Amino acid sequence: MIQVFIVDDSAVVRQVLTQILNKDPEIEIIGFASDPIFASEKLSSVWPDVFILDIEMPRMDGISFLKKIMSEKPTPVIICSSLAEKESETAVLAMKLGAVDIIEKPKVGLKNFLEESEILFIDSVRAASNARVKTHSFQNDDSKFLENHKQPKTDFSKIDTTDKLIAIGTSTGGTQALEFILTQLNIHCPGIVIVQHMPEKFTEAFANRLNQVCKIQVKEAKDGDRVQLGSAYIAPGNKHMEIYLSGAQFHIRVLDGPLVNRHRPSVDTLFHSVAKAAGKNAKGIIMTGMGNDGANGLLKMKQSGAHTIAQDEASCVVFGMPKEAILKGAVNTILPLSKIVGEVQYF
């Protein structure tokens, strides 16, 4: 039984989430509170397997409560937040602090959204219950070789086009894993294209924050972007991203379309396009996340001559996507996160 505690100042959210999650016989709501102060009082006698947490609440904000949870008893936390710009940035910070998922909460039509998103919430709770949220101490085996000598940030208008391409797909736990990798790269690394399952607007905030802490350039991808050395492009939320070859240059196509594996952006969509556009000049990496998105596309990349890598179980928050790719025969190499850094830098 997966025990869940809901902390949200909206009575509608607390009521409807309780109703839809209770439909799953494996999920039990053991408590809820309108703010973290009330939650703390109730948590003296019970402790859940998963928290669902709002960000903006009276008396104590969600980030402060998240820090309290992670310091006292690290537990999987799902952020359920609106898409206001300020909250988007805060939600990205929550992921850095250990939250395992973000679910977009609209400001209008909230009750209908919650009822229509029953499968989304149940799947998220199930995935979160399997997540490892203790602080990881990733010992980077390639650190001596990745000294970046405080090199200047990439200038998109001047840098050369990449002739190699790194494609990364990830979901639950991916924000921390991506930050671990990207912050250690220097501006001579190949161009990188990334699908991180994340709602619209959160991807922009995530890319902007990474850009502030990385030596390479990190941005939310735009339709028509030319993929360049020393740069990483994150697929925008609620859009698919594909790569195509124009002359000798890789370009990005951002497009609408139906959900693929219940996701938009989809890792499979990206990987299939990279297989076609780059072939053996690409490297595909599937990392921590729930579900099977990316497994078919990674197999197509492998068949096209690309080298394919899966993050190992020990360093994953959720060993779902890598496991599915391995079982499908799509993976050449299984590596801990600490070894993936060098695979990206030195391709």
Curated annotation (Swiss-Prot):
Signal peptide: none
Reaction equations catalysed: [protein]-L-glutamate 5-O-methyl ester + H2O = L-glutamyl-[protein] + methanol + H(+); L-glutaminyl-[protein] + H2O = L-glutamyl-[protein] + NH4(+)
Start and end residues of each CheB-type methylesterase domain: 159-347
Disulfide bonds: none
Top EC class, one word: hydrolase
Domain Response regulatory: 3-120
EC number: 3.1.1.61, 3.5.1.44
Matching HAMAP family: CheB_chemtxs
Function: Involved in chemotaxis. Part of a chemotaxis signal transduction system that modulates chemotaxis in response to various stimuli. Catalyzes the demethylation of specific methylglutamate residues introduced into the chemoreceptors (methyl-accepting chemotaxis proteins or MCP) by CheR. Also mediates the irreversible deamidation of specific glutamine residues to glutamic acid.
Similarity remark: Belongs to the CheB family.
Name of the featured protein: Protein-glutamate methylesterase/protein-glutamine glutaminase 3
Lineage, top ranks: Bacteria, Pseudomonadati, Spirochaetota, Spirochaetia, Leptospirales
Name of the coding gene: cheB3
